[in-house]
């Protein structure tokens, strides 16, 4: 039993299997479809939290601009879905049929050249994965090669998220502006609004999330993961050993961007829209909170942290519409101050030892030999014997 308890610890196969059981069996059987769809949306954010565990927890680099890569992945998928929904027959009432409605409203008469690759689904998938990763490579290479890290890197990533938000809002004729891209209903002719489609998208999201955890766990157990930890704690020693610290950090940043882009694309499929409100500074900071609450050193904990924070956000906003922001802040501060290592640290430092002690006591009580039955008491007979006569 002790092995099972340790087996279910953070970043272990047991923790991954337990999470898989919760996501694949427990939640679909216990939640109605609307709530399950919300969980699927929350799991899209969990991809960003996984990337932050690798970048921040293992690499020691805090990024406050992960919403940029989440938004690029989401907008890439939204562009393909919007073009599919803007076929000439559906948009025949427009001045220029065959282009998105917001382009027609802004008197654009032809599809821009940089939109054309998103008419192909395979090319769209390739761009969703490569464009955010390439942007992360450019930013990371420029910063880490100049040994920019710490709070300076965090501020720069915040600035990038602000720039992208302003760019999206300002180019209303090409991006939909502040309203974003809406009415994204079909994927390759498949209606994503039906109950069966939502259920399928949920399980696809779960499958990709579990695969991402396996990938990140493999990286953590490899020499690369060891080097990331060493660079976080003793950067100069790793550099003096002959390793290029900058390129390893660039890799971690690119991996985090890749995972965030996957989450953004799945988010667009789940909810049917994409807007600049999911790209800016505030959502980027919220994504850091997901990893901090779950535990920035735990992949599985990051998923639980994402679910907990978003579930609390949903409950508080429904029950206390005027106070939910303060309650969310109080929850975050309470968790961070009481448990600096997040939910995963709470499990390993408090819950796991408690379970081990309980199992040990149960074993001791079962292994203790039973006391032999006491002999019956000797009762003196009142009948006189022959020796008394």
Q: What residue ranges belong to the model's regions?
A:
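Transmembrane alpha-helices and adjacent helix-loop boundaries
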Residues: 1-389
């Amino acid at each position: 039993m002790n092995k099972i308890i340790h087996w279910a610890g953070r970043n272990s196969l047991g923790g991954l299997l337990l999470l898989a059981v919760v996501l694949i069996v427990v939640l679909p059987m216990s939640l109605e479809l609307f709530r399950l769809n919300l969980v699927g949306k929350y799991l899209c954010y969990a991809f960003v939290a996984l990337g932050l565990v690798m970048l921040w927890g293992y690499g020691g680099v805090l990024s406050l601009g992960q919403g940029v890569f989440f938004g690029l992945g989401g907008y890439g998928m939204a562009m393909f879905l919007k073009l599919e929904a803007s076929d000439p027959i559906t948009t025949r009432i427009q001045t220029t049929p065959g282009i998105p409605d917001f382009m027609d409203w802004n008197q654009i008469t032809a599809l821009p050249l940089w939109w054309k690759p998103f008419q192909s689904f395979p090319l769209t998938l390739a761009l969703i994965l490569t464009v955010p990763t390439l942007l992360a490579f450019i930013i990371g290479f420029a910063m880490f090669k100049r040994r920019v890290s710490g709070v300076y890197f965090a501020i720069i990533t915040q600035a990038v998220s602000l720039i992208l938000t302003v760019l999206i809002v300002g180019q209303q004729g090409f991006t939909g502006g502040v309203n974003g891209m809406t009415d994204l209903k079909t994927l390759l002719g498949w209606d994503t609004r039906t109950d069966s489609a939502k259920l399928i998208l949920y399980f696809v999201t779960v499958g990709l999330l579990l695969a991402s955890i396996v990938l990140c766990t493999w990286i953590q157990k490899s020499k690369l993961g060891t080097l990331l930890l060493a660079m976080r704690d003793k950067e100069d020693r790793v550099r003096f050993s002959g390793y290029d610290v900058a390129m390893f950090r660039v890799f971690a940043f690119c991996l985090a961007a890749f995972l965030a882009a996957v989450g953004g694309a799945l988010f667009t499929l789940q909810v049917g829209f994409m807007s600049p409100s999911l790209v800016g500074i505030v959502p980027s900071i919220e994504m850091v909170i997901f990893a901090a609450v779950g535990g920035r050193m735990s992949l599985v904990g990051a998923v639980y942290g994402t679910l907990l924070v978003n579930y609390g956000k949903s409950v508080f906003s429904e029950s206390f519409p005027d106070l939910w922001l303060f309650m969310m802040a109080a929850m975050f501060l309470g968790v961070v101050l009481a448990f600096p290592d997040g939910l995963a640290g709470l499990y390993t430092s408090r819950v796991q030892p408690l379970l081990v002690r309980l199992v040990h006591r149960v074993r001791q009580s079962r292994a203790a030999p039973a006391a032999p039955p006491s002999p019956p008491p000797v009762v003196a007979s009142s009948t006189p014997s022959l020796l008394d006569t």
